[in-house]
Amino acid sequence: MEKIFLNGEFVSPSEAKVSYNDRGYVFGDGIYEYIRVYNGKLFTVTEHYERFLRSANEIGLDLNYSVEELIELSRKLVDMNQIETGVIYIQATRGVAERNHSFPTPEVEPAIVAYTKSYDRPYDHLENGVNGVTVEDIRWLRCDIKSLNLLGNVLAKEYAVKYNAVEAIQHRGETVTEGSSSNAYAIKDGVIYTHPINNYILNGITRIVIKKIAEDYNIPFKEETFTVDFLRNADEVIVSSTSAEVTPVIKLDGEPVNDGKVGPITRQLQEGFEKYIESHSI
């Protein structure tokens, strides 16, 4: 029987209930992580949970869990649910309290929920590429926190769906930031460009992996801002995330990226990613 982790216990889905006064439900007052499972093993799980605890610290949420404890509960969940290829979703909120914008009193404990699901790798997207669109970035100014507040991302993603695209690449003014659920990259003249780490983007775990792969393959990797026009005129465009992995964007705003085919550097990164899965899954 499927199990859900809820506040320290492994329970059935029918028992996994939260209060209508949970601050995650009322305010989006919480954080989350999304972790890949390959061949029954957790991929880059330490990096994910280090970020999870950083996000918690940034919003003043004391979870009383170590990275090691979070990894252990994740392993148990994967084993219980017999997940081979899939994901773990975990979120923590500031707990259950009467509706009030200020933080609740100290005795209110955080609420933590985690569950698994089988989730295939996006082989078609990886092989053939996807369509993308550009859209103004209307999100808040702490995108470095993996917050439950995702309305701006949801609206951007729905804009992409409306125009038959898989991802919306966002920009503040003319500066490209990231995708609605991914980091974004422009590849030009053999160099990979992506927005530098600051409050405007999430430091994606797959982004970190891509940077390491680029170093291994001696591909220049520049963390600097670039414009929408630069993106549209790139030789290759990719987006990356836990679920998307290294996905090529072959059409942007209805126009082909370069010749509309998946490029050679993208293929190198994908090759390196396969090796990274083998070496960084536990």
Swiss-Prot record:
EC class: transferase
Disulfide bonds listed in the record: none
Protein name, entry field: D-alanine aminotransferase
Residues binding substrate, per UniProt: 32, 99, 101
Annotated active site: 146
NCBIfam families: D_amino_aminoT
Record-stated family: Belongs to the class-IV pyridoxal-phosphate-dependent aminotransferase family.
Gene: dat
GO molecular function annotations of the record: D-alanine-2-oxoglutarate aminotransferase activity; pyridoxal phosphate binding
